[in-house]
């Protein structure tokens, strides 16, 4: 896997899922692996965010999105709970 960086917010959300919902955590981990294989295509319906240039989103489930940015060979996870700017 390439270099993966979590913002403080995203890391706290990731830890939340570890304690609250293993199924959602498993889905997030699957999305992270798929992002490593192809940042802009694959599972979770990857799409660029219209109001945030350079940021992409993938569906975790109906209510939650994984938001990330890829630059210089690294992926920064912005959030993994809620829907975009929640």
Predicted features and spans:
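Enriched for short, Lys/Arg-rich terminal
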Residues: 1-4, 8-25, 30, 43, ...
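Short secondary-structure junctions
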Residues: 38-42
């Amino acid at each position: 896997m390439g270099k993966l960086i979590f913002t403080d917010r995203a890391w706290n959300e990731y830890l939340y899922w570890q304690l609250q919902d293993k199924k959602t955590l498993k889905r997030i981990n699957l999305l992270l692996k798929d992002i490593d294989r192809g940042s802009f295509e694959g599972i979770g319906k990857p799409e660029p965010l219209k109001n945030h240039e350079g940021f992409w989103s993938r569906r975790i489930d109906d209510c939650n999105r994984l938001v990330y940015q890829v630059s210089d060979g690294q992926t920064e996870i912005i959030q993994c709970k809620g829907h975009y700017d929640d």
